Amino acid sequence: MLANPLSQFLIKPIIPLEALGYNISITNSAVAMIFVSIAASMLLITAFVNSKLVPSRWQAFGEILYESNIKLVHSIIGPQGKKFFPLILTLFLFISLGNILGMVPHAFTFTSHIIVTFSLAMIVFTTTLVYGIYRHKLGFFSLFLPKNIPLWLAPIMVIIELCVFISKPISLSLRLTANMVAGHILLKIIAWSIVSLTWLFKPLPIALVIVLIGFELFISILQAYIFTILSCVYLRDVVNLH
């Protein structure tokens, strides 16, 4: 009998804890996020502490990571986007390393849970909202009323633009979660199907799994990149009010 492909997404307590009647257990999801946070920090520290004129491999990797993200921020948001670079780099590292960690056998993919991806999306949403109001004051609300709109159409457009603005963190989080869940379920089903086959028919499915693992690793990086691109687009809208 094949194992339930959804069982890999179960959040399980590792260290049961309770305080004031609330469950604050340390779970496999929390451990995975802590591990990724430490790994991302160590990666940056290793890359940039004691940097040299002739870079080491880690320093070269860190410089590529830095330059690609700073160029992304500058090309989408503009010169004023430099202040958002730490946020964008952090999001990219956290999501990409979290996705890659999920490819390790028996590791937990925390980006497969909407509560995690929605929390990340809400960080971006809150940043855009707070910065937009701080920078433009009441002028921020002109974002919901496109220029040269007939007066009779204005109320409808305000409602539509407001709904689009509010739905951004929902679409941002759902896109990432759906891709991670779909890819892992497909891999799980094919991998478990190989077990029931005779040795004569196993080479082709095994080759397919290897190809899918490589593709899933690519998707893991791509989804982190898409998340950061869309985050930059949302930030650009409030920086330039369009």
Curated annotation (Swiss-Prot):
The keyword Transmembrane applies. The chain crosses the membrane at residues 29-49, 84-104, 114-134, 140-160, 181-201, 206-226. One of its GO terms (cellular component) is plasma membrane. Pfam families: ATP-synt_A. It is found in: Cell inner membrane. Keywords: ATP synthesis, Cell inner membrane, Cell membrane, CF(0), Hydrogen ion transport, Ion transport, Membrane, Transmembrane, Transmembrane helix, Transport. PROSITE patterns: ATPASE_A. Its main location: membrane. It is a multi-pass membrane protein. One of its GO terms (molecular function) is proton-transporting ATP synthase activity, rotational mechanism. Key component of the proton channel; it plays a direct role in the translocation of protons across the membrane. F-type ATPases have 2 components, CF(1) - the catalytic core - and CF(0) - the membrane proton channel. CF(1) has five subunits: alpha(3), beta(3), gamma(1), delta(1), epsilon(1). CF(0) has three main subunits: a(1), b(2) and c(9-12). The alpha and beta chains form an alternating ring which encloses part of the gamma chain. CF(1) is attached to CF(0) by a central stalk formed by the gamma and epsilon chains, while a peripheral stalk is formed by the delta and b chains. Belongs to the ATPase A chain family. This is ATP synthase subunit a. The lineage of its organism: Bacteria, Pseudomonadati, Pseudomonadota, Alphaproteobacteria, Rickettsiales.
